Amino acid sequence: MEIVNKQSFQEVLEYVRMYRLKNRIKRDMEDNNRKIRDNQKRILLLDNLNQYIRDDMTIAEVRGIIESMRDDYESRVDDYTIRNAELSKQRREASTKMKEQKKAHAELLKNAEK
């Protein structure tokens, strides 16, 4: 019985660890979503700004700078999207492990009662 309790305690610790990991991943994904949204707003801002700037109003290099900034923001959006996909995969894996562990623990308790 003591072996079952020790194993059960270890499983509970592992379950808590997985639950915390899952929550951390969820927070990271929400943070990435905010970053994606912010950078998409910046892209829109730069697009609008680019419509108002005329060659006779300012130096042509300004357009190059704006385009460079826009490309940078688009790259960031892509990077965050990829990171979100990776985090989502980790979260699904953690959920699967937690379900398996919960099922195994239930079976262990069921067998211990016999």
Swiss-Prot record:
InterPro entries: DUF496. It comes from the Bacteria. One of its GO terms (cellular component) is cytosol. Residues 89-114 are annotated as: Disordered. It holds the Pfam family DUF496. It is found in: Cytoplasm. Residues 70-111 form a coiled coil. Keywords: Coiled coil, Cytoplasm. The keyword Cytoplasm applies. Belongs to the pole-localizer TmaR family. Pole-localizer protein involved in the regulation of several cellular processes. HAMAP family: Pole_loc_TmaR. This is Pole-localizer protein TmaR. It comes from Haemophilus influenzae (strain 86-028NP). The lineage of its organism: Bacteria, Pseudomonadati, Pseudomonadota, Gammaproteobacteria, Pasteurellales.
